[in-house]
Amino acid sequence: MASLVLSLRIAPSTPPLGLGGGRFRGRRGAVACRAATFQQLDAVAVREEESKFKAGAAEGCNILPLKRCIFSDHLTPVLAYRCLVREDDREAPSFLFESVEQGSEGTNVGRYSVVGAQPAMEIVAKANHVTVMDHKMKSRREQFAPDPMKIPRSIMEQWNPQIVEGLPDAFCGGWVGFFSYDTVRYVETKKLPFSNAPEDDRNLPDIHLGLYNDIVVFDHVEKKTHVIHWVRVDCHESVDEAYEDGKNQLEALLSRLHSVNVPTLTAGSVKLNVGQFGSALQKSSMSREDYKKAVVQAKEHILAGDIFQVVLSQRFERRTFADPFEVYRALRIVNPSPYMAYLQARGCILVASSPEILTRVEKRTIVNRPLAGTIRRGKSKAEDKVLEQLLLSDGKQCAEHIMLVDLGRNDVGKVSKPGSVKVEKLMNVERYSHVMHISSTVTGELRDDLTCWDALRAALPVGTVSGAPKVRAMELIDQMEGKMRGPYSGGFGGVSFRGDMDIALALRTIVFPTGSRFDTMYSYTDKNARQEWVAHLQAGAGIVADSKPDDEHQECLNKAAGLARAIDLAESTFVDE
């Protein structure tokens, strides 16, 4: 897949997907100082930069980028994240996005990785209660909002970003965060109101967004790193002051990446067979019998013509002394995917390896990519080919996929210009680390009177995690699952200053709540005391007329156990040492 402007399909660290990279020994200070010299601009370049900045402000641009390009051979994205966010600062909003792109013949390392920390602004929504924090202006306001997604959109309407040459074709700044599955309740207020939602046992935000002015973009093809700071002119008394402050902020960001005291990453060895499932997960939001009863109930609704399909999920719980960032480092090895993410948000940390976009808008083109239909990977290319044909000849899985393509066409069509919706690709097979999926691509041209936020509202949640018809399926999910889903099956990603959007579907995503618990344990055997974390691994199965309850329950177990292997690896590498 070609790199998209402001896409979050970004790349693994260099060196590729290893646990031990990033430890500098010996002449670390000298390395840092030499690297730092590459950030300097000569006098001519400084004058040119200042001239372009002031010209942009004179033309009415109120958000303007300043950037430096540095060598990246002394730094990895994982280490860069740790330079910006201390190990003990686990509630500081921040993110690391990476990617391995998939295709019919296997995997390719994505071109870009993106790191962000210290958002200038945050939006936190819980049901209809919204808190907006502007850290730059040191202000906070709380308000009731029928649709909190209109708030970031209204803020974006005030933006006039400067478009400059030299920025990479990746996400370079803007909103980053997550949208829970339950944000659908802002749209379907009558059929899916918050008042009728299942039990909210974790009290997580429904939306968390941070506005990131400081961004570090790794280009793994050109072997360089773009360090970017966006300047808000409205926060300063003059353009001159804005430029000088912006330069100082950029230099401060660079100095954190080039500090003499660069943090170290714990080295590790891969001791486990990462292709195997993780340890059995004993604790779930539903017992085996309760889940099987829910499958039977769903089939009754299908046979009655109430729905065609519904996705029933259950949330598994795993306790671990592995830190969430260690789990992310392990997940990069266990399950490299198009949307790798470590996202520290308010109330939780997301560790994700999603294979699928929720929605993408680039230059007003909407993209929806249904991913449904699964079979295991073969042990050889020849076996892969055999299994691929077996998957494409599976009538049940192909019928489900076509149904979801139709749902995708409907979602895109709601916000597209008449006649612009197309199925660009139909039923391609993509290979991932452990499985193969059937994939299709639906596109459309966004209507002139709408924005990317409307495309997100139309898509969320996608049919692959809800069912068909979508709203009726979600009503049944509320009745049968018993707990609010939270981030699972919602989306995470970014919306750029230019208005492009790339949101991944929150599948294969581990949720670590950060709120204190009365039963948290501690380990004092390590050099540093370790806190016990609760990891939530949620997985679902698509229920159709001929579904077998035992098989669907086992599918949930297998999906969650595959994700749990990352926790096993993190424990064996970082905790048990």
UniProtKB/Swiss-Prot annotation:
Main location as per UniProt: plastid
One Pfam family this sequence matches: Anth_synt_I_N
Transit peptide boundaries: 1-34
Record text on activity regulation: Feedback inhibition by tryptophan.
Ranges in coiled-coil conformation: none
Domain of life: Eukaryota
GO annotation, cellular component aspect: anthranilate synthase complex; chloroplast
Catalytic reaction(s) noted: chorismate + L-glutamine = anthranilate + pyruvate + L-glutamate + H(+)
One annotated GO molecular function: anthranilate synthase activity
Quaternary structure (record): Heterotetramer consisting of two non-identical subunits: a beta subunit and a large alpha subunit.
The protein's role, per its UniProt record: Part of a heterotetrameric complex that catalyzes the two-step biosynthesis of anthranilate, an intermediate in the biosynthesis of L-tryptophan. In the first step, the glutamine-binding beta subunit of anthranilate synthase (AS) provides the glutamine amidotransferase activity which generates ammonia as a substrate that, along with chorismate, is used in the second step, catalyzed by the large alpha subunit of AS to produce anthranilate.
Descriptive protein name: Anthranilate synthase alpha subunit 1, chloroplastic
